Amino acid sequence: MNEHTQAYMVEVVKKFLDGGFDGDKWNYEVHQEIAFIGGIGGLEGKITDLRFYIIVGDETVTCYHTAPIKAPLEQRAAISEFITRANYGLTNGNFEMDFSDGEVRYKTTISQHDLLRNDAAAFRSMRVLMMLGPSMWQRYGDNLAALLFGYTDNKSVEELVCQCEE
């Protein structure tokens, strides 16, 4: 991909975040011209706030949604099992955990082709990029937090994930 295509993808991301497609503006900062960082509040459940990080790469745009909690070392194996079970069957994105510090995030990626076709396709793709992570955090976040803090009512990790998917 050439630098003009990447510059165009950066402009599409900015247009979306600035409300240029639907009027919904996002609070964000630009870092190193190809990265955007911001926050989302008002989610329902135990995890009410998320941060988002958007990286415009050579051929893709990736968004990470992170919660303001980290898995303690002694919980990382259980959290890893939880996110592995949650990820099974997901088609657009996945949970990840950084074993070095316990950060858990939801990652969504779209290709340059999703942004280069036309404005309607770009808007739909950006909407998925920005809204899927919060949706997954709302779906799985309460039981993930329960597991992190030991409030599982003696339910297994498998039961906790199944409860999210009911």
PLM segments and residue spans:
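Amphipathic alpha-helical segments
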Residues: 2-27
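Ser/Thr-rich, low-complexity intrinsically disordered terminal regions
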Residues: 19-46, 61, 67-68
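Short, charged/polar, Gly/Pro-enriched secondary-structure boundary elements
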Residues: 43-48, 112-115
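Intrinsically disordered, low-complexity regulatory segments enriched in Ser/Thr/Pro
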Residues: 51-72
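Short, internal acidic amphipathic alpha-helical interface segments
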Residues: 66-105
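A short acidic/glycine-rich loop-to-helix N-cap element
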Residues: 114-128
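A conserved amphipathic terminal alpha-helix motif
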Residues: 125-148
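Short, highly charged C-terminal tails/helix-capping segments
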Residues: 143-166
